[in-house]
Design a protein with these regions (language model features):
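Catalytic cores of the polymerase beta-like nucleotidyltransferase superfamily
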Residues: 1-236
């Protein structure tokens, strides 16, 4: 596949590198490009701390500075630039109470949800893939990074995202990841109705709207939409 990055993204990467920082395109943009799709947006991961990012660029917005994210506005478009980090405890089952900034790209990739979203890219180094994301794309598999049960206990929305990615991409959910969803299903109650509906709508609008049945099969539906669950009977 060929990576053709927008000029604005190249300029941001170049500026960070010129000042001695590591910087990569990260996450969904890498996944989409590998799959031959045009990314909707480009997120950048860097060793630069938020205050350093703000010094380097003329127009920035503190969109998530607590978690290391600054939006850099370049040619009237915003690009999220996030410092490499590790996450602290997830006491609410959705968000880390704290984050620790790190200088290591691998540690940053290790905190991400699925292998297909845990890759980075830089023109001079190519794709950085510590957890087999390219292989899982080739084999059409949704797989958690690390221990899936731990990933879902950190952020319960990830269970629903796994099924949404499965529906949108027509990928299979890896066995251990699927088992962990079934085991942790009750935790979906910690997720707001708005976020649940957002993910469910994406499933229904995908090429596999029938994947809504998977919400029943893994036990999520009974906690999300009990009135709809009754249409299916008992979870498998």
């Amino acid at each position: 596949m060929e990576f053709i990055l927008p000029d604005s993204v190249m300029n941001i990467l170049s500026r960070l590198e010129t000042d001695g920082f590591s910087a990569f395109v990260a996450g969904g943009a890498v996944r989409d490009t590998i799959m031959g799709k045009t990314p909707h947006d480009y997120d950048i991961a860097t060793s630069a701390r938020p205050e350093e990012v703000k010094k380097l660029f003329r127009r920035t917005i503190d969109t998530g500075i607590k978690h290391g994210t600054v939006t850099v506005v370049h040619n009237k478009t915003g690009y999220e630039v996030t410092t490499f980090r590790t996450d602290g405890e997830y006491s609410d089952g959705r968000h880390p109470q704290s984050v620790s900034f790190v200088d290591n790209a691998r540690e940053d990739c290790a905190r991400r949800d699925f292998t297909i979203n845990a890759m980075m890219y830089l023109p001079k180094t190519g794709i950085i893939d510590y957890f087999g994301g390219q292989r899982d794309i080739e084999n059409k598999i949704i797989r958690c990074v690390g221990n899936p049960e731990k990933r879902f206990k950190e952020d319960a929305l990830r269970m629903l995202r796994a099924i949404r990615f499965s529906a949108v991409l027509s990928f299979r959910i890896e066995d251990e990841t699927w088992k962990a969803i079934k085991k942790c299903a009750v935790l979906i109650k910690k997720v707001s109705h708005e976020r649940i509906l957002e993910e469910v709508n994406k499933i229904l609008l995908s090429e596999n709207p029938d994947y809504i049945r998977k919400l029943h099969e893994c036990g999520l539906l009974q906690y999300m939409m009990p009135e709809l669950e009754r249409c299916f009977g008992e979870p498998q």
